[in-house]
Amino acid sequence: MTIIRKSHPLFKIINHAFIDLPTPPNISGLWNFGSLLGMCLVLQIFTGLFLAMHYTSDTLTAFSSVTHICRDVNYGWLIRYMHANGASLFFICLYIHIGRGIYYGSYLYKETWNIGILLLFLTMATAFVGYVLPWGQMSFWGATVITNLLSAIPYVGQDLVEWIWGGFSVDKATLTRFFAFHFILPFIIAALAMVHLLFLHETGSNNPLGIMSDYDKIPFHPYYTIKDLLGVILLLLLFLTLALFFPDKLGDPDNYMPANPLNTPPHIKPEWYFLFAYAILRSIPNKLGGVIALALSILILAFLPYLHTSNQRSMMFRPLSQVLYWTLVTDLLLLTWIGGQPVEPPFIIIGQLASILYFSIILILMPTAGLIENKMLKW
């Protein structure tokens, strides 16, 4: 008799995706972040659901409803801080996941990679609209500044901004629709994550060597389920330490002040996970140019499969590419720091140089390094 997990129409799908899935035997801990992202998404959906039960999306009561959650709801403070810090955790995992994909050449699975980029955009959109909901000072001004960037689009820009706002400024209509978007988007992300997995399982997982491993596979369960479980435990340890001991470490103190359209905060800046893109935006003195650079800073990921010039897939045995890769990582950390600084010397020039370096490494230096390494292998 066939085991039920192999014959049942529903269990069969789960079996092929998580139990009997043929997996390369040499994938490292960096491959854990896919499952950790899944865990983060589930965590965010559940904590978000409980927060939505007590939250009111009205400009007059939004701020006080968040206060009410923290003070009066049973474990409301914990749910709120888990949700807020869960977003940071989500982006940490997301950036490491993308970084691993770049290092080991996973972007050559084009369908999986492109859906991943779409998932990144949707996650960023979800985080942005979610940050507006507490209706603090930084929520209000962040929403005003970022949505206003769309007015740089020729002809339709201003109409587009007013259409998103639902009026002539960020107000009740904006908050209500942002709450609606923030509620629905995670479910769209979950559906797309399934498609992401579907395409990944068509080709099979990549591995650190970047070579085909079809002749040498092991089942996902029990080997990688145990490995993923270890990752989950370690991540939860880090997460709960952050949420319970340092709940406001990654937040902005300005957001503890109710939104006031008549009083601008001294430094308007987004959450830490958007600072690198914000620094690129600010490094160009032209509004439209800045918006284009901002969009390209993420969209550039879609060009990676076409900029791959090396004969080897992975960077594991490519020393020049490795140096450039870690320079890129350092550059992104530098941009993140600059994004949180005021617009004044020497931060302006550092931001501009870091932005130029970011695009130069990806568009020019990495493809050139690939060609040089090909030549070196022939000598």
From Swiss-Prot:
Protein residues bound to heme b b566: 97, 196
Residue spans crossing the bilayer: 33-53, 77-98, 113-133, 178-198, 226-246, 288-308, 320-340, 347-367
Annotated a ubiquinone binding sites: 201
InterPro entries: Cyt_b/b6_C (IPR005798), Cyt_b/b6_C_sf (IPR036150), Cyt_b/b6_N (IPR005797), Cytb/b6-like_sf (IPR027387), Cytochrome_b (IPR030689), Cytochrome_b_C_euk/bac (IPR048260), Cytochrome_b_N_euk/bac (IPR048259), Di-haem_cyt_TM (IPR016174)
Residue stretches in coiled coil: none
Record's cofactor remark: Binds 2 heme b groups non-covalently.
Record text on subunit structure and interactions: The cytochrome bc1 complex contains 11 subunits: 3 respiratory subunits (MT-CYB, CYC1 and UQCRFS1), 2 core proteins (UQCRC1 and UQCRC2) and 6 low-molecular weight proteins (UQCRH/QCR6, UQCRB/QCR7, UQCRQ/QCR8, UQCR10/QCR9, UQCR11/QCR10 and a cleavage product of UQCRFS1). This cytochrome bc1 complex then forms a dimer.
Name listed for the protein in its UniProt record: Cytochrome b
Organism: Thomomys mazama (Western pocket gopher)
Gene that specifies this protein: MT-CYB
